[in-house]
A protein has these predicted regions:
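Short, acidic Ser/Thr/Gly-rich low-complexity loop/linker segments typical of extracellular
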Residues: 1, 91-112, 133, 443-468
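Single conserved hydrophobic/aromatic residue that forms the stacking wall/gate
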Residues: 2-7, 11
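Secondary-structure boundary elements
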Residues: 14, 82, 186, 190-351
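Short, ordered, surface-exposed loop/turn motifs in non-cytosolic proteins
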Residues: 67, 75-94, 115-116, 423-454, ...
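Short Pro-Gly-centered beta-turn/loop motif in secreted/extracellular proteins
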Residues: 108-119, 124-126, 133-136, 456-489
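Structured interaction patches on ligand/partner-binding surfaces of diverse proteins
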Residues: 126-148, 486-514
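Short active-site neighborhood of thiol/selenol oxidoreductases, capturing the structured segment around
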Residues: 546-570, 574
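Short, internal strand/loop/helix patches
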Residues: 589, 600-615
Length: 615
């Protein structure tokens, strides 16, 4: 578990302090950190220091900890100074860096963490090495940095999380009852607000009134939730058939979150985008306001005023002139934006300085304002211009007098194909849930390839079958495939496979999901003759046993905490596996603690749950 020091909904809705997230879950934490303004001189371990804040390690406030020292050696046994040491935690099927340190003159770096396992990855000048570190068991660890990219091999890791160390405070019946009353009041406020959102029925009525596509309008307005008035205002302004098609396309290009907070000013600004010849490129890479993770702004109108007509026409005719202008005029200072949120394109124009990511967003935004199709590649993170021949990488760091396309325009690519032998209950591994791909950088570190994860409510996303079964194109280079099987104990059986992609060649590897001999582990006793009362709309309200309802064999039983975040997250996760669970065909019994709780459950909030559920 990795966390920053922020309270959660689970914590705030408990009857007493330290009952929710900050107790049992936090006791299994590996690293927690927070930021303190200015230079901090306290007892906590310092993670990093910036001109405005100090980041400190506060894991000791929440979980038992241990300190470990890592010594990085080269292939001859000599200590390596100034090597990058990354402490990695298995999370979402990748080894995610939770702390990054530099070795001292003796090749040493240290970290204090919860008593579980991490992967330590050391790199410098293209060489790297790695080893598993068990905090609490390994007080010293030597990492031999003797590997270079290019060699194909695989290594297995079993990573064990810290044990739970819960110290639950007592809760009196009076405290529980008082908290239940508060939750009823809070839920009434929330439900009163949610009741004002547009439903499928009201959205379709609006669509018919304004002669818009009913299905598209319904999806958009229901998804916009509390921002539906802005979306309705925008749609009502779409008069011609062309503008109606364009407006709906624009709304379907932005993310679900954008629909919930985009402003009318932004939508109107981007509806007036300049045209380019390729209609598909215009929809995806010109009119689309979303570049990366920035706050959406009406930047097209801004640049129309800020950039002269002559310059805009020159950039459109020769986009590399825009690359040269940005490389020469926008100074990159990664310390100027310590908060991390991207600087707006307008802000970059005015300041002429930005962090590298904000600079990249600025370039794409400026290009789109001039009808030059451009994007930041969602998988690799590279800035690209889009032409009839495909996507071309541009190097905004190159010498401004000699701007060129990287790899002479289009990067050389090969193909990756992975075979997979299904294990029980998993016939199609999912990206982020079961496997990830990362590219090795020239320095020796790893950069995740960020494929589509799908939508928690709608499913979809990247899987083995739609990415690797028939093969996918990758830039030439060295890569790592990480797979992981999570056990009931929380431990992970991982396999890390190193491989190389050559230009115009196909690389074939095997995607392996490791299994435990004790895959189904007994974690408690369960009486399948236990009785429950189905809700009236389930067909029968007569009490029956779980065995009667589900039959023998596998089934799932869950107890719902109504309107609580852990339950809501779990239900959305279940909804994303609707097709798989219905194909499995076994029953799922979701229980409520009592009739009062059952009455508060809004089933319409989770429309995509499997049909195999019994409430």
């Amino acid at each position: 578990l990795l966390a920053s020091s922020a309270a959660s909904d689970v914590y705030k809705r408990q009857p007493v302090l330290n009952l929710g997230w900050f107790n049992a879950p936090a006791s299994r934490g590996m690293l927690m950190h927070t930021k303190v303004f200015g230079r901090y001189e306290g007892a906590e371990e310092v993670m990093s220091v910036t001109p405005t804040y100090t980041e400190i390690n506060v894991i000791g406030n929440y979980a038992p900890t241990a300190k470990a020292t890592v010594t990085v050696m080269d292939g001859h046994g000599n200590p390596v100074s100034d090597a990058c040491v990354e402490f990695k935690l298995y999370n979402y099927a990748e080894f995610y860096t939770v702390a990054r340190k530099q070795t001292d003159a003796e090749g040493k770096a240290f970290l204090t963490a919860g008593k579980g396992d991490m992967l330590v990855w050391a790199s410098k000048d293209g060489k790297f090495g790695y080893a598993k570190l068990s905090f609490g068991k390994d007080h010293e660890l030597v990492v031999k940095m003797d590997k270079t990219a290019g060699g194909g091999h695989a290594v297995d890791f079993e990573l064990v999380p810290p044990p739970e160390n819960a110290e639950l405070p007592a809760v009196t019946p009076e405290q529980r009852a008082a908290n239940d009353r508060r939750m009823v009041h809070e839920d009434s406020i929330r439900n009163a607000y949610v009741s004002m959102f547009m439903t499928d029925e009201t959205a379709r009525y609006f669509a018919r009134r304004y002669k818009l596509d009913e299905d598209a309008v319904s999806r958009i307005l229901v998804a916009s939730r509390g921002n539906h008035r802005v979306i309705v205002d925008f749609m009502a302004r779409l008069r011609s058939e062309k503008s109606k098609r364009g407006g709906l396309d624009l709304l379907q290009r932005i993310s679900a979150k954008d629909l919930r907070d985009v402003t009318l000013e932004v939508l109107m600004d981007h509806m007036q985008s300049r045209m380019c010849k390729n209609a598909d490129h215009f929809r995806r890479y010109v009119r689309n306001p979303r570049v990366s993770n920035e706050i959406l702004t009406p930047y097209k109108g801004f640049f129309k005023k800020a950039v002269s007509k002559e310059d805009a026409e020159a950039y459109k005719a020769e986009p590399m002139k825009l690359v040269a202008w940005v490389a020469q005029n926008i100074r990159v200072d990664n310390d100027c934006n310590l908060g991390g949120a991207p600087i707006s394109p307008e802000g970059v124009w005015k300041a002429r300085v930005a962090d590298a990511h904000s600079r990249d967003i600025f370039f794409v935004s400026m290009a789109r304002s001039m009808a030059i199709p451009a994007r930041i590649n969602g998988v690799t993170g590279k800035v690209q211009l889009i032409g009839d021949d495909g996507a071309m990488d541009v190097d905004l760091n190159h010498h401004p007098e000699e701007p060129v396309f990287m790899a002479e325009g289009i990067a050389s690519k090969g193909k990756l194909v992975a075979s997979y032998k299904p294990i029980r209950s998993l016939d199609n591994p999912k990206y982020y849930s079961h496997f990830t791909l990362s590219k090795q950088t020239p320095q020796g570190s790893l950069q995740l390839l960020s494929y589509d994860e799908g939508d928690a409510d709608m499913g979809g996303g990247t899987t083995w079958s739609n990415l690797l079964k028939e093969g996918t194109a990758l830039e030439a280079g060295d890569y790592v495939l990480v797979t992981g099987t999570r056990l009931a104990s929380g431990a992970v059986l991982s396999k890390t496979t190193f491989f190389n992609i050559l230009p115009e060649k196909t690389t074939e590897i095997e995607l392996v999901m490791r299994e435990s001999e004790d895959e189904v582990q007994v974690i408690g006793n369960f009486n399948s003759e236990s009785l429950f009362t189905p809700l009236p709309d389930a067909g029968s309200a007569a009490r029956q046993s779980l065995l009667q309802a589900c039959g023998r064999g596998y089934f799932v039983v869950g107890i719902l905490g109504v309107n609580q975040e852990p339950t809501n997250h779990a239900l959305r996760d279940i909804a994303s596996f609707k097709a798989d669970l219905e194909k499995w065909g076994r029953k799922m019994v979701l229980l409520f603690p009592n009739e009062a709780k059952a009455g508060k459950f809004a089933r319409e909030s989770f429309p995509d749950l499997p049909s195999t559920i019994i409430y």
